[in-house]
Amino acid sequence: MDKDFIISFAKLMSISGYEYCCEKEVDALVEGIFDESFKDSLGTRFFIKKCGRENAPKILVDAHLDEIGMVVTDIKENGFLTVTNIGGVDTRILQASDVIIYGKEKIFGVVGSTPPHLQSAEDTKKLKKIDELLIDTGYSKEALEKIVRIGTPVGFDDHYVELADGRIAGKSFDNKACAACAVDAIKNTPREELAGDVILMLSAREETGMLGNGASVGAYRIDPDYALIIDVNLGRTPDTPKTETVELGKGVSLTYCPVTSKKLTRMTAELADKNEIKWQISVSGRGTGTNTPDINLTREGIPCVDVGLPLKSMHTCSELLDLNDAQAASDLIRAFICSKEIAEVFAR
């Protein structure tokens, strides 16, 4: 899997509710791959690649495009900004972080941090709330107000680092790395090999799902025969529980839980084995923390398989993935959209 393609997606500014800001860039990244494209009023993008056969099954591949971020709540004296979070920002890592403020022009800022020399013993035990933090821009208030206003989105700085053994770290791999994997899979699949018409849904507002999820609206509009949802899954580290995480470098995860189709998941696992694609099991007694529950409950119910890309340090500015897992994700999506066996079972 091409790391530069993944990073090109991850660099896009698509904070929940502001997905429209990257429409032109997304169009450029998928140019020449799809037959049709359109969007809805929530900001979800749809891209269709047809198999060329009449009355073909509709296969939905969902990868949410939005990312966590912040939004300006006030402009203070001496060029400081206050913000609140959009989605589940990990406030533990915010102090001293580099950020980008997407105003009339893109400007940079740093989240302020009190030096340890000036902190009391009690201060060191406290975690500041996000609305207590200040972003330093270096501008005067007067100059800043010409560029930024209340309601301006703020995101993590878009720097990326390459680690050993094919691992990379940076912002917004949740979930734009998965979007890149889905595009890569569809791009590399000749239409005559498709088991049906494939609809890629780059859904909006997953990170703020309690406020209304773009996936449920989009799935209702498309009304697919069955669906594959790809999102990141919690990567295992020495300090995290084995039962709630998956390993990097061991391939994608397939989630068994009440809202996934057991038959579709089993057939997808068999497909992975047949194509020698690495995969691992993820189990939940509830939902998935992805778009799967929303899509599953759409209309009369849509059979879903939940595919996970292992990711460490989720919801931070340094999310970490393994490119081999990304390749496995792309390979499995390609095998899935080409599976005549799955189409025969789940086509309505």
Regions found by a protein language model. Give the residues of each.
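N-terminal hydrophobic/helix-forming segments and targeting peptides
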Residues: M1-R348
